[in-house]
Each structure stands twice: as C-alpha cells, then as structure tokens.
Amino acid sequence: MGAWPTLPPYGHFLGITVEEGPLFRMPFGISVTGRPHFVHGGALAGLLEIAAVGTVMEALRDEAGAHVKPINVTVDFMRGGRERDTFAAATVLRLGNRIANVEAFAWQEDRAKLIASARMTLMVRRAASGGEG
Amino acid sequence: MTQPTPPERPTDFDPVLVTRMVSSFGHNGALGARYVAHGTDWVELALDYRAELVGDEETKVLASGPVIALMDMATSLATWVRRGRFEPQATLDLRVDYLRAAVPERTVIGHGECYRLTRRIAFVRGFAHDGDPADPIAHVAGTFMMTEVA
C-alpha cells in the first residue's frame, strides 16, 4: 500500500492492519479479549489511539521530520465489541502548527453502530515551524 | 439524589486473587499486569516494560494504550474493593492525561481509586508513575456502570 502508517510495535501486538483511508482493522483474538467473548476496553482504546495518531501522521506525510505526542484522550465505550473484526477511522478536526484535535470511531459490522469513540489532543512537532499557529 | 454506598470493610473480595485470575487470560494476560498493593478504595498494579508494547520505535517509549488498559484494570479493581465484592460492570468512559513519556525500560505502576460509588455508577480516578509517585506519567478519570443492577 505504501501509505502511512508504519505501525508501532504496540500496533502489531494488537494485530492491527491498515487499509486505504486510512482504515484500521483489529481482528478478534485472545490477546484483545476482555471478559470472555468481548473485546477488551483497553485494546479498543489502543486501536482508537492508533487510528487517531495514524490519521494525523497521514495528514503530515509531506512534512519530513514531523511527529506527534499525545496530550490526552477521552474514550467513550458505547457497546460491547463482539468476536469479530473491529474497524476504526479518525477525523482530524483541526491540524494546527502545534496542536491537532482528532476524533476517532470504532465499529464492527455496521459503521453507523459505533462501539467506541475517542477524542484526542496531540502536540505536533514540525521540523521547521512557521506561519499561523 | 442517590445515596452513595459507604466504603465497606475488606470482605470477600480479594484483589490479589482476582488480579491473578484476570491476568491469566486475554488482553490483560497478554499485557501481564501484576498486583502490588491495595487499600479500602484503591488498588495498585505494575506493568513491566516490554519491547512489544512500545509506541514509538525511535524513542522506545511505551505506547499509551497499555497505560489505559493498566488504569482501566486498576480502577475496576478499586471499585470492587470499595464495594467489598465483585459486581459486573462496563467502562462508560475514561480520560487520560499524558503528563510525560514513561522512561524506557522502567516498570509502570498504576494506582486506581474509586472515590464515589452509587448503586449503578462508580466514579474513579488514578495516576500512573514509573518510580516516583510525585512525578506521575499519566492522570486518569472515568466512570463505570453496573450492568446487572436493575
């Protein structure tokens, strides 16, 4: 695919793969199971964060040396995740010089039925800063 | 307004045993969090550094996801020690402030506290540090809902 994102080791630990979009897919498996037959909330939060960071990195792909650091995240859990693939995608609400505000969503068979969402604030570090903040 | 349940004395709920059980299975098992200590309304767990939990290959800093999972588990256990028994619950929301990056190779300690308990909702907060509780790496706040209370 060639596109970002190169997943960090933790992304591989969760079994996440990236598709066009970017769309993030986390298959069900023992290592992401919480209570029996359900996806663990921590794994869902991890998927949402990886989708949020990955989508910001995708938006920054033309800027060599740019990277981000998480400031905070708020995760809402809306439905239990069942024994099937979980998908996640993110929207960059604002990409400033220093701060990115991102919203990420996770669902399973029906994109309209969210199982979790996250709002994330990230610090953006650009190689050469300039322009409006 | 709902009356909060007062903190109960330590009873049947054994966080040592439950941590061992929970950590033997699934995502918590893969993370491998260990029991450290507990009080009447708090539980402390430890997460050892592992290369596969790294979030940034360049800096070798632990990803934020495992810190959320650790705090979710520590705060969940805190609700049960405060209640004095296990009660099925679901996480409604969890907010994490990443105060600074954890130092690579260091074990992360997660301190979870249940500061208010009603019949249906548990309010929790906590922090994580990598050696010095006065210099935390993360602060969390969240709520749980009891799933089997009418």
Residue ranges and their predicted role:
Chain B
Residues 15-25, 77-86:
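Short, solvent-exposed helix-to-loop capping segments enriched in aromatics
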